[in-house]
Amino acid sequence: MKVVEVKHPLVKHKLGLMRSADINTKDFRALATEVGSLLTYEAATDLETELVEIDGWCGKVEVERIKGKKVTVVPILRAGLGMMDGVLEHIPSARISVVGIYRDEETLEPVPYFTKLANDVEERLAIIVDPMLATGGSMIATIDLLKKSGCKHIKVLVLVAAPEGINALQAAHPDIELFTASIDSHLNQHGYIVPGLGDAGDKIFGTK
């Protein structure tokens, strides 16, 4: 499995701001979008382009365009919605597929409750967004759903990832690509990433 920890100074700076215990909802939400945008930029570096001829201001000119790669962005509800706009800034024509999965606080197992995928998801590159890759359970379940629907090309964007989640994802889906702003230290006894971001969903939505 390809794992990319994006070490750009802007990514590290913005993620550092997000780690503050007293960050407000407005700033956390904005930074989640900004870091999601920067991760998208990194994840899109291998998209193929082709030359097309257009009418320029001084006549015909050849320009590069993305070559026939259709995209669907897949936010995992609910926290993934906080990163979705960062992807759409660069790929505004992407279709939106939604997967609702929550983690049982006692068993830490993923529990699916809603799925609405793009009609032609099997023809698209799926970019899954979720702030945290902790145990990996929710992400693995989401990828399972996408593959069962025929999706073959999948990339994952997360703000922070735990080694435990990366290992689980590698074991379950070695063919996907993972892009993260940080590989953090470990999971604590409650299944939270350390140092992590706290509860990203609560911080994005202003709930507790």
From Swiss-Prot:
Superkingdom field: Bacteria
Pfam family for this entry, one: UPRTase
Residues noted as binding 5-phospho-alpha-D-ribose 1-diphosphate in the record, renumbered to the chain: R78, R103, D130, P131, M132, L133, A134, T135, G136, G137, S138, D199
Bound cofactor: record note: Binds 1 Mg(2+) ion per subunit. The magnesium is bound as Mg-PRPP.
Keywords from the UniProt entry: Allosteric enzyme, Glycosyltransferase, GTP-binding, Magnesium, Nucleotide-binding, Transferase
GO BP term, pick one: UMP salvage
Enzyme class: transferase
InterPro entries found in the cross-reference section: PRibTrfase_dom, PRTase-like, Upp_B, UPRTase/APRTase, Ura_phspho_trans
Keyword Glycosyltransferase set for record: yes
Activation and inhibition: Allosterically activated by GTP.
Binding-site residues, uracil: I193, G198, D199, A200
Homology family: Belongs to the UPRTase family.
Purpose of the protein: Catalyzes the conversion of uracil and 5-phospho-alpha-D-ribose 1-diphosphate (PRPP) to UMP and diphosphate.
Protein name listed in UniProt: Uracil phosphoribosyltransferase
